[in-house]
């Protein structure tokens, strides 16, 4: 059963400006500890695109849940990792999911400077209704 669909588009130059003003603060605000480890391994030239994709992905996932960031789910509740082939894998904190039935999140990310886009689909094998 389809729970929800969400999408988000982010202008990478917007993230570049934020990084220029707040080089460490912004990453720490939106990334989980697992994501910060990946971020630290990147060269600075890739920081803005990485953060833009994570920002867009988390917004898309929250929209697919039907709530949006800051409306019941936060940036730190969602972790975006990649499998060995580069496919994005979404982990959602038990703080948010403990009342939900099992679900799968499908996420697609793309970037072509100056924009990146994220598209998320959440499905469940159970009949559930979210707020």
Curated annotation (Swiss-Prot):
One of its GO terms (biological process) is fatty acid biosynthetic process. Pfam families: ACPS (PF01648). One of its GO terms (cellular component) is cytoplasm. It catalyses: apo-[ACP] + CoA = holo-[ACP] + adenosine 3',5'-bisphosphate + H(+). Its EC number is 2.7.8.7. It is an enzyme of class 2 (transferase). Its main location: cytoplasm. Mg(2+) binds at residues 8, 59. One of its GO terms (molecular function) is holo-[acyl-carrier-protein] synthase activity. Keywords: Cytoplasm, Fatty acid biosynthesis, Fatty acid metabolism, Lipid biosynthesis, Lipid metabolism, Magnesium, Metal-binding, Transferase. Coiled coil: none annotated. It is found in: Cytoplasm. It comes from the Bacteria. Its cofactor is Mg(2+). Transfers the 4'-phosphopantetheine moiety from coenzyme A to a Ser of acyl-carrier-protein. NCBIfam families: acpS, pantethn_trn. Belongs to the P-Pant transferase superfamily. AcpS family. This is Holo-[acyl-carrier-protein] synthase.
């Amino acid at each position: 059963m389809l729970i929800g669909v969400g999408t988000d588009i982010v202008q990478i130059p917007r993230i570049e400006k934020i990084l220029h003003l707040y080089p460490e603060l912004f990453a720490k605000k939106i990334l989980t500890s697992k994501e910060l480890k990946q971020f630290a391994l990147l060269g600075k030239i890739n920081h803005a695109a990485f953060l833009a994709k994570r920002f867009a992905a988390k917004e898309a996932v929250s929209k697919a849940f039907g709530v949006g960031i800051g409306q019941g789910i936060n940036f730190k509740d969602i972790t975006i990792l990649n499998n060995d082939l580069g496919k994005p894998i979404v982990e959602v904190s038990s703080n948010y999911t403990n009342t939900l039935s099992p679900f799968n999140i499908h996420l697609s990310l793309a970037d072509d400077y100056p924009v990146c886009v994220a598209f998320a689909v959440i499905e469940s094998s159970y009949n559930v209704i979210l707020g």
